[in-house]
Every structure is written in structure tokens, then in C-alpha cells.
Amino acid sequence: MTHIISNKPLTIEKVNEIILNDKKLELSKESEAAIIKCRRFLDSKMGDIGRPVYGVTTGFGSLCNITIPAEDLSQLQHNLVMSHACGTGETVRPEIVKLMLLLKIQSLSYGYSGVQLATVQRLIDMFNNDILPVVYQQGSLGASGDLAPLAHLSLPLIGMGEVTYKGEIRAAAEVWKEMGWEAITLQSKEGLALLNGTQFMSAHAVWSLIQAERLSDWADKIGAMSLEAYDGRIEPFYPQVHEVRAHKGQIDTAANIRKILEGSEIIKQKKVHVQDPYSFRCMPQVHGASKDAIAYVKGVIETEINSATDNPTVFPDEDLIISAGNFHGQPIALPMDMLSLAMSELANISERRIYKLISGQRGLPHFLVAKPGLNSGFMIPQYTAASIVSQSKGLCMPASADSIPSSQGQEDHVSMGANAATKLVRVVENTERVLAIELFNAAQALEFRRPLKSSWTIEKIFAKYRK
């Protein structure tokens, strides 16, 4: 199966489909033409440009006022990629590196970057053959693009760096030899086009959004099972309540939980308690707020992954080469910090439901075992959940609240969006672990409601989980 790279907007769903189905990439004829046209325009300007063009005929960052001789322009780009590959820390997981490749290819395909067609094609070759550069998590300020990680992504193009291929980390030069590929000789601006961009941040955001939508759905299902196990009330989920406070996420969550619990004997039985704790009763408001946040962030990220984010931007039709700031990560740094909060809150409220289920209330035994004392039962899973939730709260300190000037003050405001991106992944993973612990507790607690049955949906989840 093949996905054609074109001007047709990518959606999060389409990206997920490409990755899950291991689709190959191919440039549309229109994209090929746009890339070639932009490169030819840039080449035509090299002889009579008449003025310095940042990163094309000059140095980089605070070295922007140093003019580079024409005979050194290719070496300039080669040196840029080498000098900026200064990442450190843990390596980025292969599935996110593959997303980085896809998003970089998409961004370059619009024909505003001035790269050679051969450069984009080699990136496609790498994607299609699962030859994934070794990229490190630390090093990007999220402005001037994701310089260090994108340098590591680009090193293999020039026959340098390391790649993961067939489960092994190997020198790119060795793999290139096996594949019969030649190293790319970068032309003017190409190194900058490869390094200036937000694909490190965007790839982490896309991965996190895919998981966030899945976990948001599971939070409703697991929360509904906990509500049943706790012998909770259905009235707080009635549509009338939410019509008078019409946040979409809230309305959708209430409707979802009503549907999940449809046909339950437990929810229909007479209740002796007047109301439930907030962690049960306010699921529509809390889960719903996270749904709304996910939807907002999704819209922003979909705009970003369909954008040209390098600098300078080349406009052949307008006869313009403009040095500007589309590399700056602020537009996605703020939403990624927001998504961390949204996912952390799903874990936060989940942990509170876990706590209630083991508290010996509403006919449930202490710690969900028949002989508490002799057995500690489900005591410690709640400790684990509390520890994870506490960690996520710390990770929710907004990375985008910080900025440290760099490059001798030329780059005097940065987004720190890459830090927002990497900690977002950790928060998402933490949330999944906490929801898994809640499911563990809810399934055990549900046993104590027998012989009453829950809904068909809950019983199906229960049976599959217990199996």
C-alpha cells in the first residue's frame, strides 16, 4: 500500500493509518514539480542575488553577518548538519523517528524550502525501508526549529551518523553501502531546510494525540466499570444536566457513559446513598474537559503538520526569499503543555476512584479481599497509582513558561517546545498505567456485586480482562 505525498492535508487519523499499515510513501507529480521549481529558482538567484540571504550565503545564528563565498556554500550546509548534531540523553523511540521522517517529507514537499528532489527522495527511501536515524531526546530549544534532533535525523543523508535497521543500530555509511546509495551532496540552503523545522516536536505531539484519543475512550469505559463496582448513581449522567452547561466534551462523556451502562442490573438497583464522590459524579465534567483539550490540540497539530516550518522561506512565484520565524515552536508548545495537563487529570481522577474502591465502602471489603489483614489485597496498587500521578503533576510544569536566550542573544526567545513534547509522552504513558490499575481494581470490585450483572459492554470488557 502506498500513500501519495501531496498538498492534500494530513490528518492525525491518516498519519496513524500510514504508520499502522506500514504504507510506503511516494511523491505526487505536483509535489515533485513544486520541489524542482523552488530549487531552480534558488539556484537562479545564486549568481545575481545582490544581497546576503540568511543561511544561504551567510553563517547561522549570531554568525548571520558573515558572508560565505560561493565556492563554500555546499560545504557550509554539510558543516551545519555535522556541527548541530549535538543531541544527548535517551534515544527517541523508532515509531516517533518514523513520524519525524514522514512530517519532514511532508513539509519539504510544498516547494517552499529550496531542497533538491534527490534529498526528499532519499528521505522517502529511508522511510520506505525502515532505515531510521538514531535521534536523541535532549538538545532542542524548540526555536530555530528542532536543530539538534533534526541534525541527527539528517546525518545519514550525508553518509554519517547511525541508523536503526532490521533491529540493529549501525553506521549509516555501512547501510548506505548495502543499499547501493550514495551520500547526498547538500546544496545551498539544504542543511538549513533540513534542520529548521518543528518535526521533532510535531512527531511527539502526533504520537501523543493518537494515544490520548484512545486513552480518553478507555477512561470512560474503565470509569463506568468503577461506577458500577462502587454502586454509583446514573442520574449525574442524564442529558438534561449537561444541556444546561453545553460543553461538547462534557455532553459526549455523559452520553458515552450512559451508552456503556445501558442494560446494567447494577445501575438500576435501588440506591441507599444520596450522591457519589466527585471522582464518580463529575466524570462528564472532568473527562469532558480533557476531551475538549484533546480536540483543540488536535486542530493545532494538524495545522502544524501541514505547514512549511523552515527558514528562510522561498516563494518562486513572488520572486521572494524571506527570512522569518516559521521554525518557532510556540504555536505547538503551549498546546502540548495543555495536553499534558489534560492527560494528567484523567490519571488524577482515576487514582481517586481506585482509592474509593479499596476503602471498604458500600459493601465492598477493605482492599477488595475476603480476608483483609491476613491479605493486604489491593492496597499497594493504589500506592503505585498515587506515585505515578504525583510524578505526572510534576511533569505538568509548563515547559513553554521558560525561555533561555541562545546564539549570543540573536535567538533571544525560544519555546522549549521540545521539552514539552518529551514530557508529554511520559505523561501519556503514566496515564495509561494508572488507568490499567483502575481496571485491575474495578474488575476485582465488580466480583463483589454478583450475582447482579453489569451492562453488555462492561461484562464483555470484564470477561476479556479476566481471561
Where do the PLM segments sit?
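C-terminal auxiliary extensions adjacent to catalytic cores
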Residues: 2-23, 27-34, 38-41, 46, ...
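Conserved, non-catalytic sequence blocks in retroelement Pol enzymes and Pol-derived host proteins
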Residues: 112, 141-143, 373
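A broadly conserved amphipathic alpha-helix scaffold signal in soluble, globular proteins
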Residues: 121-128, 148-151, 155, 217
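FAD-binding core of FAD-dependent oxidoreductases
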Residues: 54-68, 72-76, 83-108, 136-158, ...
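Short, low-complexity, polar/charged sequence segments that are solvent-exposed and flexible
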Residues: 72-75, 119, 212-214
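Polyanion/phosphate-binding surface patch
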Residues: 49-51, 66, 253-254
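Glycine-rich, flexible loop motifs
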Residues: 2-50, 77-135, 227, 242
